[in-house]
């Protein structure tokens, strides 16, 4: 009998069969002494698999400039991690706000565009790069969602992720065989940005393999960096560190899943356009996704949605699109059902919500309204 068509042909069902369902450390399996006992063992396994490199303590941020725009007080920050170029970040909150506010770490997407980072989900002036105006129109309903959330009474922090924006790999630092003719002579020019992004896409496997050779993983790097951003956010005098969340679309949804699984300081999360199963990646959709996703060895112990489940009973929301070209609907549904079961088994069914919307891969205004209401429910109540 011929196997169903899949990413790796005749090897597909064999490979899928290597992963037990449920996996070895799943909370969907009976026999755990307590929720806390499961979380301690499963989270430690997850953290061990990430192989996070040392990323320092709470970053010492420098304010590059402070402006007010569209009713928001905005700080443009930078800080230096123990490696790589400085990280640029944006903080937004309502102008004139006082006291400690709830806060959200807003995580930008991948989107096949490594030239940009924070600018994908923020606006700090009327002068918006045409590529970012188009990006926000395509994926976010034409708005900068970090601004929209800040306007509701939050301190919102957005940082350039590892290999994006200020943290991107630069042509001048590369050996000739890897550079492949890449230059950065007119960095804001649209044609040069397109060339950079095409180069960066082709460079992903080199970067990922190099990180493996360094004894770490791509998720381990960005989770560590997002935890340092969380350290900074929680240290701010205008932030109530007991009311902090995170969220994002696509690559930002991936970062939401992984950060929430690693760090219980995340009291509420919303992952948009990034909830499926390892089986979906393995058999159907790995070719559509970045190397940022993969954590070697972990699927035998935890399915992808169960990483987010490690943060139970803290609140979690996942938002999916029925026509999302990056996933299959049955596996999005199966992943959502896994989280429903985990939260039910933990006695906190009301703290998880999974929703589906019509349309392609996106986090549009309707989805944003639901996400913002979710943050309000758990961080502002």
State where each predicted segment sits:
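Short glycine-enriched nucleophile-adjacent loop
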Residues: 253-264
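N-terminal targeting or regulatory segments adjacent to alpha/beta-hydrolase or S9 domains
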Residues: 1-73, 81, 117-118, 152, ...
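Cap/lid segment of the alpha/beta-hydrolase catalytic domain
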Residues: 99, 107-224, 235, 281-285
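Alpha/beta-hydrolase fold nucleophile elbow
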Residues: 238-250
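Proline/glycine-enriched tight loop/beta-turn segments at coil->beta junctions
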Residues: 84-87, 94-104, 110-113
């Amino acid at each position: 009998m011929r196997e169903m068509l899949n990413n790796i042909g005749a090897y597909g069902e064999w490979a899928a069969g290597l992963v037990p369902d449920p996996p070895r450390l799943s909370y969907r399996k009976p026999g755990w002494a307590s929720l806390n006992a499961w979380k301690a063992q499963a989270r430690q396994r997850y953290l061990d698999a990430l192989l996070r490199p040392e990323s320092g303590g709470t970053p010492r941020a420098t304010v590059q400039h402070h402006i007010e725009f569209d009713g928001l007080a905005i700080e443009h920050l930078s800080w230096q991690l123990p490696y790589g170029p400085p990280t640029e970040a944006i903080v937004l909150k309502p102008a004139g706000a006082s006291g400690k506010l709830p806060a959200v770490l807003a995580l930008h997407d991948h989107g096949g565009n490594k030239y940009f980072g924070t600018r994908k989900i923020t606006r700090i002036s009327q002068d918006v790069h045409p590529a970012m105006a188009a990006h926000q129109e395509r994926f976010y309903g034409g708005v900068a969602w970090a601004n929209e959330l800040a306007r509701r009474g939050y301190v919102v922090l957005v940082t350039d992720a590892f290999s994006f924006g200020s943290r991107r790999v630069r042509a001048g630092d590369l050996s000739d065989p890897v550079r492949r003719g890449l230059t950065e002579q007119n960095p804001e020019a649209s044609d040069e940005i397109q060339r950079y992004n095409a180069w960066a896409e082709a460079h992903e496997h080199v970067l990922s393999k190099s990180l493996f050779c360094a004894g770490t993983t791509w998720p381990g790097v960005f989770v560590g960096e997002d935890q340092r951003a969380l350290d900074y956010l929680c240290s701010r005098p205008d932030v109530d560190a007991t009311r902090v969340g995170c969220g994002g679309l696509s690559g930002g949804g991936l970062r939401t899943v992984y950060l929430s699984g690693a760090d219980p300081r995340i009291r509420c999360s919303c992952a948009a356009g990034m909830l499926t199963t390892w089986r979906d990646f393995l058999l159907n959709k790995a070719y559509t996704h970045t190397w940022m996703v993969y954590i070697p060895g972990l699927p035998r112990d935890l399915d992808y949605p169960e990483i987010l489940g490690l943060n139970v009973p803290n609140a979690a929301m996942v938002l999916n699109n029925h026509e999302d070209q990056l996933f299959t609907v049955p596996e999005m549904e199966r992943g959502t059902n896994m989280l429903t079961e985990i939260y039910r088994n933990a006695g906190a069914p009301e703290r998880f919500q999974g929703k589906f919307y019509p349309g392609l891969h996106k986090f549009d205004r309707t989805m944003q309204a639901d996400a913002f209401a979710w943050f309000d429910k758990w961080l502002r109540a």
